[in-house]
């Protein structure tokens, strides 16, 4: 079925409220285009729930690339629930910004999140705890109040601002680094008058030339340590764990309005009631991957195992050293409750497979242009024929590269292969470009697809999977050589998650021996990784004494 035909039928069918529709044969990477198309027809909020962070990041990139309006992002934490580590401030800041804007935004919206994030309890929608501070050039402001806002809303006072979530005050100058800016911001006051707003270089500390007219400061943390919320926490904590818990480091830190590492694991104690991101949406149509409920089941199993380990840990510790964990059902929706809440909304389930009983989209994945049996053998003639055929059929053809360097390299290769191409940065650029051939852009797309009149080819489609590396991954986090890890160290595999390095071993594969790293996962499952693929691992550092390994084959990671 053509996408437009399906959307018209889906949007007109009022009786499908609280029922599920299925749409199959959806190529990986095309979800953002489909969501944006659906939003044009359905005059309601759309909540898209991704199966994992990897898919979330890819769809987020494509939505930004398409410059879709009224899109909001609610990512999951980059930490395990019971770790004594707080999430990255870029993540918490973006979550709070989304919660603030969802409360006051008008019109239809697209909200992107993940299975784990959508099941997590957050501050009630009716609360007024989350606020943003708007400052304008020429306005009069109290510097003490600005400092109080920054401290209360999660910014850390430092000598020099270099990282997101930091601020510094020197006389009439306030520097701070909000997550929604690529550079830190400098406020230059003359008395109480805000003279200048500029961004500046975090390394040199030198201001950039361009002035800003105004700036919106959003909180960096989801937990605001003001008097009301601290009192809420103290009351709930005492009620749950008794008077002896007052001696714990967590209780003392919060009582003193000092952020405690991993404080997000007690987030529900700070608020009078709990909500989820679903509650922040206005009677949304929920679009979700068809594996979401299975992922929620696996996630609940993981949480229960982590919680039991924490309880065992607490039983051997003094009151001051106990973790005082909240149970999984205090932090997240259980699998049955999650299913019931989602079922109260009109649903559309996406599947990459063809649905024999449902509706299937008229779309295709791109077949690779490389030879699997010949290293680095690219079939450029086939690539050229595919591009030319689609252009002759009046289809739009684009190539998504993983980096600017890749884009320049591929444009040179195309020139040598007599393949017409042009460069562009975002979708709106296409209106002002003399388009001839294939358009080349930088976009986080691991697989290409053809959807009606649009074809995207990915870098991986040309060079193969082993040569592709997502631009989202910072190479500095990967292990460079075997001397970087020792037996017993915890590692994170880019595909399989948290495991433990056991030792090196030689495996006989097809009559030859290969040196491999033996990695252990939950239930003593083993994964053998060839040493030449060492870059797929990064070292995991945590002060958590009871680390729960990920489960091989689970959808949670």
Residue ranges of model-derived segments:
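Conserved beta-alpha structural segments and adjacent helices that either
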Residues: 1-544
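Long, low-complexity intrinsically disordered regions
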Residues: 541-557
